[in-house]
């Protein structure tokens, strides 16, 4: 869930930044990217917990559900409620970098000759940006998005520990502490399979995103 929101918002913000490079939005968000990436991620997570749990008690400090657990539809809503703070924390840390990378990729693409030709034909700037620029810049952006999804499936050890979330990263750590070799092998095999499947998916989808790759393959 976090990875999907992160990729969508990051790409949209990056496209907006690329549309007006050097603008107030571009400069302010670029500075924010440097500030956030200069902070330890676990420290920012602890700050959010201190603020949203103890100063303004809006969310629980961690865990996947309340004790005792509710029943029925209330159980689903309770799980979503416990997911809000971890997802919000990860989102605030990672989507800035996603937007910055998208911005740099698209800005480079907008300098190409075919973009200037599209503008010379009188196409609307939005169509030039999303219809031509984004399509040409799609392969690296899609790669970035798929790798983000794969990393989210693998788990994030530090955040799962801070928020006491029972994910794959936390399971890795418990298996290492207990020297549980079968669990470690199972997790490693699952992670390897997921990554290989993701890379195979990227190879297939590249042919649809960039016709030059498809033609080169046929030759």
Where are these regions (language model features)?
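Alpha-helical transmembrane segments of integral membrane proteins
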Residues: 1-25, 41, 70-219
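Membrane-water interface segments at the C-terminal ends of transmembrane alpha-helices
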Residues: 31-62, 82, 89-95
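Peri-membrane helix termini and adjoining interfacial loops of integral membrane proteins
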Residues: 54-68, 160-166
